[in-house]
Swiss-Prot record:
Protein name, UniProt field: Acatoxin 1
Described function: Reversibly inhibits acid-sensing ion channels (ASIC) in rat dorsal root ganglia neurons. Reversibly inhibits voltage-gated potassium channels (Kv) in rat DRG neurons.
Keyword Transmembrane helix: no
Source species of the chain: Anthopleura cascaia (Sea anemone)
Principal localisation: secreted
Subcellular location: Secreted; Nematocyst
GO molecular function: ion channel regulator activity; toxin activity
GO cellular component, one term: nematocyst
TM region positions: none
Keywords, in A-Z order: Disulfide bond, Ion channel impairing toxin, Nematocyst, Neurotoxin, Proton-gated sodium channel impairing toxin, Secreted, Toxin
Organism lineage string: Eukaryota, Metazoa, Cnidaria, Anthozoa, Hexacorallia
Source organism superkingdom: Eukaryota
Cystine connections: 1-15, 8-20, 14-26
Length: 32
């Protein structure tokens, strides 16, 4: 899975607890 900062196209590309940002990178939901 992709860690924070990894490229993603959907949330499922990221590790558990991470979301896919609009710019295409995984991020922790609690961060803005």
């Amino acid at each position: 899975c992709g860690g924070a900062g990894a490229k993603c196209s959907t949330k499922s590309d990221c590790c558990s607890g991470l979301w896919c940002s609009g710019s295409g990178h995984c991020y922790h939901r609690r961060y803005t």
